[in-house]
Amino acid sequence: MSTPSSDEVNDSILLSTKKLLGVDPTMDMFDLDVIMNINSALANLNQIGVGPHEGYFVNGPVETWAEFLGHNNLTVLQNVKQYVYIWVKRVFDPPGATNHLAALDNTIKELEWRISTGREEVIRGDTEHV
């Protein structure tokens, strides 16, 4: 398993999510909508044990993935980024076809399982896969 680069870890949660959504990071007209949905995704992740115990909220472009995850959960970074992106996309820019929406829902469920399992492996210290 590769270690995330410092640029990936220190990325702004808002700006990296906007980039994945295809929204120009310099445009702020959709920030409120994107932030609200990011915070919803982060609350879901917090309920499965990822992020600070007291919760975490994005208010703008300064909050980073490292702040949310801490240094103990960096092994789940890519899954967490993908989860937040898909969660926000599903609400902010949903697909028109129901089968595409179902695919996003299935991906969200799979990522929740992977993130939860990855978090448990870190807690147990079982990072070696056989």
For the regions a language model picked out, list residue spans one by one.
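Divalent metal-cofactor coordination and adjacent catalytic microenvironments
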Residues: 1-130
